[in-house]
């Protein structure tokens, strides 16, 4: 048992002595100074980081929604969407039903020419 413990300690000492130094995956605070300031040569420096090119004004304007370019169903308010596809006969029937339920006098039927 003593020899296995000695072997383990010897292996641990060998690994610690042969350590190559800091790895590429360093702690998040590497390169930071007290007060939240970064070292200017730090790879996390915002000036040294590559940034994607900014989109052109035309691309930005094209990404915004326009009422002129909206599809017809998007331009109809939600109240009108429920009856937008209904025929005139269905709408008249709905109005008669609502008016008769409210107790209002029933309007005369208007003949529809086919």
Curated annotation (Swiss-Prot):
<keyword id="KW-0165">Cleavage on pair of basic residues</keyword>
<dbReference type="GO" id="GO:0005615">
    <property type="term" value="C:extracellular space"/>
</dbReference>
<keyword id="KW-0372">Hormone</keyword>
<comment type="function">
    <text>Stimulates the secretion of gonadotropins; it stimulates the secretion of both luteinizing and follicle-stimulating hormones.</text>
</comment>
<keyword id="KW-0732">Signal</keyword>
<dbReference type="Pfam" id="PF00446">
    <property type="entry name" value="GnRH"/>
</dbReference>
<feature type="region of interest" description="Disordered">
    <location>
        <begin position="22"/>
        <end position="80"/>
    </location>
</feature>
<feature type="signal peptide">
    <location>
        <begin position="1"/>
        <end position="25"/>
    </location>
</feature>
<keyword id="KW-0027">Amidation</keyword>
<feature type="modified residue" description="Glycine amide">
    <location>
        <position position="35"/>
    </location>
</feature>
<dbReference type="GO" id="GO:0031530">
    <property type="term" value="F:gonadotropin-releasing hormone receptor binding"/>
</dbReference>
<dbReference type="GO" id="GO:0005183">
    <property type="term" value="F:gonadotropin hormone-releasing hormone activity"/>
</dbReference>
<dbReference type="InterPro" id="IPR019792">
    <property type="entry name" value="Gonadoliberin"/>
</dbReference>
<comment type="similarity">
    <text>Belongs to the GnRH family.</text>
</comment>
<keyword id="KW-0964">Secreted</keyword>
<dbReference type="InterPro" id="IPR002012">
    <property type="entry name" value="GnRH"/>
</dbReference>
<protein>
    <recommendedName>
        <fullName>Progonadoliberin-2</fullName>
    </recommendedName>
</protein>
């Amino acid at each position: 048992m003593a020899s296995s413990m000695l072997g383990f300690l010897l292996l641990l000492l060998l690994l610690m002595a042969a350590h190559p130094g800091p790895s590429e995956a360093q702690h998040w605070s590497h390169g930071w100074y007290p007060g939240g300031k970064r070292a200017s040569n730090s790879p996390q420096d915002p000036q040294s980081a590559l940034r994607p090119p900014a989109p052109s004004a035309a691309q930005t304007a094209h990404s915004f929604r326009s009422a002129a370019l909206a599809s017809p169903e998007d331009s109809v308010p939600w109240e009108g969407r429920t009856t937008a596809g209904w025929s005139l006969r269905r709408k008249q029937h709905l109005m008669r039903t609502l008016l008769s339920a409210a107790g209002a006098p029933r309007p005369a039927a208007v003949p529809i020419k086919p």
